[in-house]
C-alpha cells in the first residue's frame, strides 16, 4: 500500500518525502530481496529508491513486516540527479491487461501502441514522442 502524506493536507511530508510505499513481500519468503536489490544498485552507482524495513501496526493491530520504499517521483529525481524535469515512465508488463511488455522495442509511430506497456507519470512535453524516438534509436 502507499501512504500519501499530502492526500488530505497539502504540504505534509515525512522525512521530507511526500509518499512512501509499503511492500509486503508476499512473493519473497525471505522478505529481504527487494531491499538487498536496492542496496546493491546503490552500491553499483545505479539510481535506486531508498528502502528500509518496518513492523507496521494500525490502531494497535499488527499488520505485519513491510519493506518501506521511497516513491519514484519528482522528489526522487531531484534527490538522485539534482533535476526533476523531464519524463518519468513506469515500465512494466500488462498495464492494460494484454500481452504488452515494456521492452523498449520500437512498436511503431502511434503512441497508443505504447500505452499498455508504459505509464507516463510525469512529463514536461512530448513524453510519448520522446519514448518512441528512444525505442527507434535502439
Please name every model-derived segment:
Residues 2-10, 17, 21-25, 44-49, ...:
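Internal "kinase-insert"/substrate-recognition segments embedded within catalytic cores
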Residues 14-16, 33:
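Short, conserved acidic/polar surface loops in the N-terminal third of protein domains
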Residues 11-12, 30:
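Short active-site-adjacent helix-start/loop capping segments
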Residues 25-59:
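A conserved helix-loop-beta module that forms one wall/lid of the active-site cleft
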Amino acid at each position: 500500500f502507499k501512504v500519501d502524506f499530502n492526500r488530505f493536507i497539502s504540504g505534509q511530508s515525512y522525512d521530507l518525502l511526500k509518499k512512501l510505499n509499503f511492500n509486503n513481500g508476499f512473493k519473497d519468503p525471505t522478505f529481504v530481496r527487494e531491499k538487498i536489490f536496492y542496496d546493491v544498485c546503490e552500491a553499483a552507482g545505479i539510481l535506486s529508491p531508498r528502502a528500509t524495513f518496518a513492523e507496521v501496526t494500525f490502531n494497535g493491530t499488527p499488520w505485519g513486516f513491510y519493506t518501506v520504499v521511497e516513491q519514484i517521483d519528482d522528489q526522487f529525481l531531484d534527490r538522485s540527479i539534482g533535476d526533476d524535469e523531464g519524463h518519468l515512465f513506469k515500465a512494466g508488463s500488462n498495464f492494460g491487461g494484454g500481452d504488452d511488455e515494456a521492452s523498449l522495442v520500437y512498436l511503431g509511430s502511434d503512441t497508443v501502441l505504447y500505452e499498455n506497456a508504459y505509464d507516463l507519470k510525469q512529463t514536461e512535453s512530448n513524453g510519448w514522442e520522446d519514448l518512441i524516438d528512444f525505442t527507434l534509436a535502439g
